[in-house]
Design a protein with these regions (language model features):
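Duplex nucleic acid-engaging cores and interfaces of nucleic-acid transaction enzymes
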Residues: 49-52, 59, 63, 68-318, ...
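Low-complexity, acidic/Ser/Thr- and charged residue-rich accessory regions of DNA metabolism proteins
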Residues: 139-153, 207, 245-270, 274, ...
Length: 716
């Protein structure tokens, strides 16, 4: 197989781009590094295309390795023909390769293998030849043998039929046809095991739809219902059509002796051997496709969450709500340093609201708090009402935000949190995390397993290795897009930087603690286990503010410093200007990028990136994102009326719509049909996590705590 050719066709890019990207990957370069600093080499392939290329490259190489193993196995058996070898070499999927290998795969004892041991294969061959005119019993009588364990003609015929059934089931062409027909025309059918059972799966108690039309979230729901033993799920294939096909392929001539036998063999082969295997395969394919879709959604949601803009320069009060154990508060300064922690008891059973307000007033006056970050877990609703009341009673201008606290409890009980705050209990740590994830979501959320962040669907039912790998890639891409401050970044953040492992990340922090702040990027080479290759991969993503070299505070890679300094010299700008806010207007002095790039001996795309960076050093891509909605008052669900227009934040995007926080504690659902006037295939075409949107209330169900919303505001 021409792997490079396949990748070129699949990705819709040039062969030269694929060749270059594969070479760079094989040389140990990371995806963020290739996407950012090797644009000329790859023709500016972005990180998304490079990730797809890398994933497919691994699959196709794995496929080639499997082909090599299979060809060697069949050759060892002395059964490899030129035609079979060609078919295996040209197969494009693992399923096709395994189909071709099936007849030669070492088997456990089967009815067919036992029949062969009893010497019945020649009888099977005679039946399949379809030439005999002798009655079947007469033919079979020749194979009756006490020694071989064939007691009578019927046993001989049954054994021959078993051999033929297995042989038919192993023909790759038949399996491919049946698989395709099952996928295209088959249905997935579910039923409830006990009609009296009440569950969230009621819509699937008597459900049937075409396999090819079953949406990913429904596949995952059916799988979960089956796993929880509430539903039975099966694939109903067009059996009559399949049997007609097999009869046509196997029965090549009408023979009154062999035709009835072969018809029985075909039915048995399909029902006993082929159908269960194809059903498993189709279910697995459906699940894989559904999981891939869910992982993509999870990844997009996670990216939006991580790339939320930081709220800088404000002292924040983190509020971890609770009932019996009290609400834990943590005051965090503008740099994320913890100034104070307190526990108050304004909620049931103690209801010490006035005491809580006095404590809040003291904290706000003492630390000049202007923003309260409230976790959205247990007792959040009650806490929000108290905060809104309190804000009205004080002269200071204070706002609050409801923050998704998913994962905060996981973090607060982790080894990492214990190391960071050894003297704090889990509640205090959680309050700190809730405050910090508002100040700098990326820096705080990288401390939490992405699976615990709560922006996916059915994540616990998926292939955990695949999920972790995909989400890890998302975090890596986000961290490298933003970059880190080498002197303040935690080990949790550093480990996602291109070329940096967990061990090296910890070594960087240790070096910092032992030697003080880094003053230039070259000092990274003094860090234990950080060699020249790791330095090449990581240096551009690590910034040093106020260091020896102003370029170290930018995302210009050290390999391009010579070109950057020459560019500044030609523009008559001192390097020190970079540290003061950038070399404004430098792009206006360039008339011919191509010519200049040749003179400076850098690529044209790299030159453009250098210019952008010199004009606005260490620009943060998160600044372009929408900031969270800050509130001073609270709404109650019972206050909502159909037709009301509200502003909200998209909290989660799933296959069938988006959940929006409108400030009433219960997120409302905007169904996919209400996201846009135009037809969209998926909600992500209209919204992303973190988007600030205007919505109209369609309906409120107080009993079920459901709010229906629409983003189609005007009537046509």
């Amino acid at each position: 197989m021409d792997i490079l050719g396949v990748l070129t066709a699949e990705l819709g890019v040039k062969m030269s781009q694929v060749e270059a990207a594969v070479k760079l990957i094989d040389e140990g370069n990371t995806i963020p590094f290739i996407a950012r600093y090797r644009k000329e080499v790859t023709g500016s392939l972005n990180d998304e295309v490079l990730r797809n290329l890398d994933e497919r490259l691994k699959y196709l190489r794995g496929l080639e390795d499997r082909k090599t193993q299979i060809l060697a196995s069949i050759e060892d058996q002395g059964k490899l023909t030129a035609d079979l070898k060609k078919k295996i070499e040209e197969a494009e999927t693992m399923v096709a390769v395994e189909d071709l290998y099936l007849p030669f795969r070492p088997k456990r004892k089967t009815r067919a293998s036992m029949a062969k041991e009893r010497g019945l294969e020649p009888l099977a061959d005679t039946i399949l030849l379809q030439m005999t005119k002798e009655p079947m019993e007469t033919l079979a009588a020749q194979y009756v043998s006490e020694v071989k364990g064939v007691a009578n003609a019927k046993e001989a015929i049954d054994g021959a039929k078993d051999i033929l059934a297995e042989r038919i089931s192993e023909v790759a062409k038949y399996r491919a046809y049946i698989r395709n027909v099952t996928k295209e025309e088959g249905s997935i059918v579910s039923a409830v095991k006990d009609e009296k059972t009440e569950s969230v799966y009621e819509m699937y108690y008597h459900h049937e739809e075409l396999v090819r039309k079953c949406a990913g979230h429904r596949i995952l729901a059916l799988n979960r219902g089956e796993k929880e033993k509430i539903l039975t799920v099966k694939i109903a294939a067009p059996e009559e059509k399949i049997l007609r096909y097999l009869n046509k392929m196997v029965i090549t001539r009408e023979n009154p002796v062999t035709t009835p036998v072969l018809q029985e063999v075909i039915a048995d082969s399909y029902n006993r051997l082929i159908a269960p295997a194809i059903e498993r395969e189709v279910r697995n394919l459906m699940t894989e496709k559904a999981e891939d879709g869910a992982i993509k959604i999870f990844g997009k949601n996670l990216e939006q969450l991580l790339m939320q803009p930081p709220i800088a320069g404000r002292v924040v009060l983190g509020w971890d709500p609770a009932f019996r154990t009290g609400c834990k508060l943590a005051v965090v300064d503008a740099t994320g340093k913890v100034l104070d922690t307190v526990v108050i008891y304004p909620t049931a059973p103690q209801n010490k609201v006035e005491d809580a307000k006095k404590t809040l007033k003291k904290l706000i006056e003492k630390y000049k708090i202007s923003l309260i970050s409230v976790g959205n877990g247990t007792a959040s609703r009650e806490s929000e009402q108290i905060i809104a009341e309190f804000i009205k009673e004080i002269p200071e201008y204070v706002q609050y935000v409801i923050v998704n606290e998913a994962g905060a409890s996981v973090y607060s009980a982790s080894k990492l949190a214990t190391e960071e705050f050894p003297k704090f209990d889990v509640g205090q740590r959680s309050a700190v995390s809730i405050a910090r994830r508002l100040q700098d979501p990326l820096a705080e959320l990288v401390k939490i397993d992405p699976k615990s962040i709560g922006v996916g669907q059915y994540q616990h039912d998926m292939n955990q290795k695949h999920l972790s790998e995909a989400l890890g890639n998302v975090v890596e891409d986000c961290v490298n897009k933003v970059g880190v401050d080498l002197n303040t970044a935690s080990a949790s953040l550093l480990e996602y930087i291109s070329g940096i492992s967990k061990v090296i990340a910890k070594n960087i922090v240790v070096y910092r603690e032992e030697n003080g702040a880094f003053t230039n990027r070259r000092q990274l080479l003094k860090v234990a286990k950080l060699g020249p290759k790791a330095f090449e991969q990581c240096a551009g993503f690590m910034r040093i503010a106020g260091g020896d070299n102003p370029l170290d505070g930018t995302s210009v890679h050290p390999e391009s410093y010579k070109a950057a300094l020459e560019l500044l010299k030609r523009a008559k700008i001192e390097p020190e200007e970079i540290a003061k806010g950038g070399a404004a207007g430098i792009s206006k002095k360039i008339t011919d990028y191509k010519k200049l790039s040749e003179e400076l001996e850098v690529g044209e795309e790299t030159l453009k990136d250098i210019v952008k960076e010199l004009e606005k050093p260490a620009r943060d891509p998160r600044e372009e994102m929408q900031k969270p909605v800050l509130r001073t008052d609270v709404l109650d669900m019972k206050d909502l009326k159909p037709g009301m227009i509200l502003k909200g934040t998209v909290r989660n995007v799933i296959d069938f719509g988006a959940f929006v926080d409108i400030g009433v504690h219960q997120d409302g659902l905007v169904h996919i049909s209400q996201l846009s006037r135009k037809y969209i295939k998926h909600p992500l075409e209209a919204v992303s996590v973190g988007d600030i949107v205007e919505v109209k209330v369609l309906g409120v169900d107080m009993a079920k705590k459901r709010i229906s919303l629409s983003m189609i505001l005007d009537e046509e």
